[in-house]
Curated annotation (Swiss-Prot):
<comment type="similarity">
    <text>Belongs to the bacterial ribosomal protein bL25 family.</text>
</comment>
<keyword id="KW-0699">rRNA-binding</keyword>
<keyword id="KW-0687">Ribonucleoprotein</keyword>
<protein>
    <recommendedName>
        <fullName>Large ribosomal subunit protein bL25</fullName>
    </recommendedName>
</protein>
<dbReference type="InterPro" id="IPR011035">
    <property type="entry name" value="Ribosomal_bL25/Gln-tRNA_synth"/>
</dbReference>
<dbReference type="GO" id="GO:0022625">
    <property type="term" value="C:cytosolic large ribosomal subunit"/>
</dbReference>
<dbReference type="InterPro" id="IPR020055">
    <property type="entry name" value="Ribosomal_bL25_short"/>
</dbReference>
<comment type="function">
    <text>This is one of the proteins that binds to the 5S RNA in the ribosome where it forms part of the central protuberance.</text>
</comment>
<keyword id="KW-0689">Ribosomal protein</keyword>
<keyword id="KW-0694">RNA-binding</keyword>
<dbReference type="GO" id="GO:0006412">
    <property type="term" value="P:translation"/>
</dbReference>
<dbReference type="InterPro" id="IPR020056">
    <property type="entry name" value="Rbsml_bL25/Gln-tRNA_synth_N"/>
</dbReference>
<dbReference type="InterPro" id="IPR029751">
    <property type="entry name" value="Ribosomal_L25_dom"/>
</dbReference>
<dbReference type="GO" id="GO:0008097">
    <property type="term" value="F:5S rRNA binding"/>
</dbReference>
<dbReference type="GO" id="GO:0003735">
    <property type="term" value="F:structural constituent of ribosome"/>
</dbReference>
<dbReference type="Pfam" id="PF01386">
    <property type="entry name" value="Ribosomal_L25p"/>
</dbReference>
<dbReference type="InterPro" id="IPR020930">
    <property type="entry name" value="Ribosomal_uL5_bac-type"/>
</dbReference>
Amino acid sequence: MTTINVEVRNDQGKGASRRLRAANKFPAIVYGGSEAAISIALDHDTTKNLELKPGFYDSVLTLVIDGKETKVKVQAVQRHAFKPKLTHIDFVRV
């Protein structure tokens, strides 16, 4: 099982997302279950390397959010139109 350390994101919107991407990170969201949705930020290079491995899209991943482990699956991925960059990922709780 794959474990990914993430950080909670407080700033939202286009400007905040652009600043994240300039810092080699990108926004994501975790939703589903009985808990509220959480906006998070992921390291781009680490996530891109994990994405290339088989099973990234169909296996259960573990996100460490503020020291708490959350089991999720990838729901949707958004990519840059012509660069090999991830721009956003939706995770759904399992």
